[in-house]
From Swiss-Prot:
Protein name in the entry: Chorismate synthase
Pathway membership, UniProt: Metabolic intermediate biosynthesis; chorismate biosynthesis; chorismate from D-erythrose 4-phosphate and phosphoenolpyruvate: step 7/7
Gene Ontology biological process: amino acid biosynthetic process; aromatic amino acid family biosynthetic process; chorismate biosynthetic process
Gene from which this protein is expressed: aroC
Catalytic activity: 5-O-(1-carboxyvinyl)-3-phosphoshikimate = chorismate + phosphate
Cofactor dependency: FMNH2
Lineage: Bacteria, Pseudomonadati, Pseudomonadota, Gammaproteobacteria, Enterobacterales
Native organism: Edwardsiella ictaluri (strain 93-146)
Length: 361
């Protein structure tokens, strides 16, 4: 009931709070015999970590991960892998002035209603700080998927506010602090971020995540559809308010003659479905987009109430991201990797002996 785990065969359980001593997770279901080191996980953690650029939160965490178990002599043993990241740059005093206030748009009010109390320091368990462990676990899945099955997962910032990326150059994504695939938009993004910092406000974003090399057959009927599990995983990311698979909400304006992905002897002629048909992967690239709200931790005064129900005004003075969509890029990759890893192992467990003569491309 606690909601701290995801996956069935490849299962990840996280723990920790924003201003607690440490963050950690247990990863079950990792196949034995895969070479694994802390360096394999650190690359994606460095992409996500706070303070990595002037466009993200000023909180500076090294996010150095430690592997506590499940790896012997540099190789996975098949047993539970324990991971730990210590928090080192907490400034809980930044939140002392608002400990009895509810930040509008945050989980403060709903957590208080659910538990009767809350950790007001940076949001506690509801903070996006928790996603560091998802990225660490996702790095394990990404390595296995790529090495064993040739599956490559990548994401990018496809929109920030009114700035929309028109060109998708994946080589460009890792060359700028926005994870933006369109070099022509970098100047506009920089100007927007400087304006947001100047006025103490924030902005929403869209992140696109894609997986190539996904084999057909992943996913189960009805409640365990691949797209259902993927949407669940992506919606669990902090600040995500919407998820699209394939053409998503654009299908409302399409006709069946346009939307259906016709098939030829050489393969599919389009990919409006985003690589999933009937909840099961088709072998085409998996494509999803997620919409992230603007963070509510801003310097602009807003109305709220105290725990006693009295009206008051609030200003959040902590260190926060003007656009959470930037650091959501490696998180989206991690969540897609966790879902694909779990479904791949489930498919192997049930259908490893299935032989299909229908062409695949």
């Amino acid at each position: 009931m606690a909601g701290n785990s995801i996956g069935q065969v490849f299962r990840v359980t996280t723990f920790g709070e924003s201003h607690g001593a440490a963050l950690g997770c247990i990863v079950d279901g990792v196949p034995p015999g895969m070479a694994l080191s802390e360096a394999d996980l650190q690359h994606d953690l460095d992409r996500r970590r706070p303070g990595a650029s002037r466009y993200t939160t000023a909180r500076r965490e090294a996010d150095r991960v430690r592997i506590l178990s499940g790896v012997f002599e540099g190789v996975t043993t098949g047993t539970s892998i324990g991971l730990l990241i210590e928090n080192t740059d907490q400034r809980s005093q930044d939140y002392s002035a608002i400990k009895d206030l509810f930040r509008p748009g945050h989980a403060d009010y709903s957590y208080e209603q659910k538990y009767g109390l809350r950790d007001y320091r940076g949001g506690g368990r509801s903070s996006a700080r928790e996603t560091a462990m998802r990225v660490a676990a996702g790095a394990i899945a990404k390595k296995y998927l790529q090495q064993q099955h040739g599956i490559v997962i990548r994401a990018c910032l496809s929109r920030m506010g009114d700035i929309v990326c028109r060109q998708y150059d994946w080589a460009q994504v890792e060359q700028n602090p926005f994870f933006c695939p369109d070099a022509q938009q970098l100047e506009a993004l920089d100007a927007l971020m400087r304006d947001l910092k100047k006025c103490g406000d924030s902005i929403g974003a869209e992140v696109t995540v894609m997986a190539t090399g996904v084999p057909p057959g992943l996913g189960d009927p009805v409640f365990d559809r691949l797209d259902a599990d993927l949407a669940h995983a992506l919606m669990s990311i902090n600040a995500v308010k919407g998820v699209e698979i394939g053409d998503g909400f654009a299908v409302v304006g399409q006709r069946g003659s346009e939307h259906r992905d016709e098939i030829s002897p050489s393969g599919f002629l389009s990919n409006h479905a985003g690589g999933i048909l009937g909840g099961i992967s088709s072998g085409q690239p998996l494509l999803a987009r997620l919409a992230l709200k603007p963070t509510s931790s801003i310097m602009v005064p807003g109305q709220t109430i105290t725990r006693a129900g009295e009206a008051t005004t609030i200003v959040t003075h902590g260190r926060h991201d003007p656009c959470v969509g930037i650091r959501a890029v490696p998180i989206a990759e991690a969540m897609m990797a966790l879902v694909l890893m779990d479904h791949l192992l489930r498919q192997r467990a049930q259908c490893a002996d299935v032989a299909c003569t229908v062409p695949r491309w």
